[in-house]
């Protein structure tokens, strides 16, 4: 599934804001609830049983039974993306386009920094094989041992944005 024109236009508009802004638009979508994560204001268990809220936020700070506001969800996402940036930027040893970095932030937000740090994707980035790195996103479509169509779609969109800097 290709990226919708609305998401594409929102990502293009976010480019001047940098990689975190790009990742945020990918995750939330142009309408705030039509992105790669969607939004749920009440905590729930994801497909692998992890307590989750808002745009995919996980952690001990989630209050079961609480209904989160849109502002609280956006604040959690901004905090989480800043954490992603702090966690993975030291491992990226070469200059990469902000669009590539934004696609990677969205990916790492979904799979976790630990998985990124040991990935072929990171190795390819540091070898300045940006296309090869972006192509690696297609390998990350499983959760709980099962391949998910939603993850396949997400990775194609992240890959497309990741490759924008190559065009």
From Swiss-Prot:
A GO-annotated cellular component: host cell plasma membrane
Top enzyme category: hydrolase
UniProt xrefs under CDD domains: endolysin_R21-like
Keyword annotations from UniProtKB, A to Z: Antimicrobial, Bacteriolytic enzyme, Cytolysis, Glycosidase, Host cell inner membrane, Host cell lysis by virus, Host cell membrane, Host membrane, Hydrolase, Membrane, Signal-anchor, Transmembrane, Transmembrane helix, Viral release from host cell
Catalytic activity field: Hydrolysis of (1->4)-beta-linkages between N-acetylmuramic acid and N-acetyl-D-glucosamine residues in a peptidoglycan and between N-acetyl-D-glucosamine residues in chitodextrins
Active-site positions on this chain: 37, 46
Family note: Belongs to the glycosyl hydrolase 24 family.
Domain notes: The signal-anchor, which may also be an uncleaved signal sequence tethers the SAR-endolysin to the membrane until the latter is depolarized by the holin, resulting in the escape of SAR-endolysin from the membrane.
Protein name: SAR-endolysin
Organism of this sequence: Bacteriophage PS34
């Amino acid at each position: 599934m290709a990226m919708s024109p609305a998401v594409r236009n929102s990502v293009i508009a976010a480019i001047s804001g940098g990689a975190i802004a790009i990742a945020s638009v990918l995750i939330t979508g142009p309408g705030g609830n039509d992105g790669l994560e969607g939004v749920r204001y009440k905590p729930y268990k994801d497909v692998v049983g992890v307590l989750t809220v808002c745009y995919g936020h996980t952690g001990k700070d989630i209050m079961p039974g609480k209904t989160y506001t849109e502002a609280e969800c956006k604040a959690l996402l901004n905090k989480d993306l800043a954490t992603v940036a702090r966690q993975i930027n030291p491992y990226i040893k070469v200059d990469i386009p902000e669009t590539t970095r934004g696609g990677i932030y969205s990916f790492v937000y979904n799979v976790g920094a630990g998985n990124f740090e040991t990935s072929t994707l990171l190795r390819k980035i540091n070898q300045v094989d940006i296309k090869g790195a972006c192509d690696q996103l297609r390998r990350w479509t499983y959760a709980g041992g099962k391949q998910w169509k939603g993850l396949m779609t997400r990775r194609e969109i992240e890959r497309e944005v990741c490759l924008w800097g190559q065009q």
